[in-house]
Amino acid sequence: MVLVSETPSSAHLRWAYMDHWRVETPQGPVSQYTSVAHFDRFLKQIAAVGFEAIETFDFHLGVLRELFGSLEKCRDFMQERGVERVLSLFHAVMYDERQSMPHVPATHDRMFNYARYIMESSRGLGVENFIVMPAGLYYDVEPVTDEKIRACADLWNRIGQMTQDYGIRTCCHHEFFCGIRSAAEIEKFYEWTDPRYVFFYCDTAQHVIAGVDPVELYRKLHARCGGFHFKDTQNVDRTEDYRRRPDAEIMAPTTPRWFWEMGAPQGLVDFPALARAMKQCGYRGWVSVEHDKADVGAGNYPESTALAAWYRKHVFERIYA
């Protein structure tokens, strides 16, 4: 992201795809990481609708190395199909106060060392962002206190400084069930983190579900915005589903499907307002499209991806241009 004085145009945005992809087969849902052939078809489909990079979880690093022999060869394979890089790795650490919990300082050394291991393990893919949930699950953190938020800030300042040595930004992504979820908690967290080392990753649907306006939040934090996850939702959590164990996204009895592709009917994210805000604030760079659990209720990932790409091209980019 670069702040500039001249007016941006849609040519200043590049589009990435945050990977939750699965396809239905007679054997059930199949991931693209099961074979080179599946990965090939996945890359060609997303490239065909205008995505130039992917984001994925860091636990896929070993699989990609096994499929292609090295991450450099994997990136060559991707580029031959029109996908430039793995833009971001989402850190899939299992938060546990015994060994990895951001608000527990005794676990910080282990978390730091694991993050450094991911940095070393990801060389060759062109990664630019290390995306993290900055606190544990809400029910593991509550009551959320200033002391706990400061402890989280201390950890990510330390890790963020280290990832800069690898040319990678540490970006914080606030799920609606995260221990740092409200506007007040988020404001404190970014006040107590170093803007040189810790960046904000704006997930539009997650903030809406948590009762936070992502457009207003982006305007406040635009100078620290490392990127976006564009997805929509039709629901705000009004019954404290964020406290559901073990996974609020799948255990909430009120909401069978939290996430939808941008432009979906009854969507609550104001993407036109966000496009105007990004234009006014001079945002340039990568934007990621995501549709987590798109296959709930007989949906599918290829369809959601194509619908989001249509909205991106025919609605969002025309406003931003």
Tell where the protein language model's regions lie, with residue ranges.
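Active-site groove signature of glycoside hydrolases
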Residues: I118-P143, Y166-E175, S288-V289
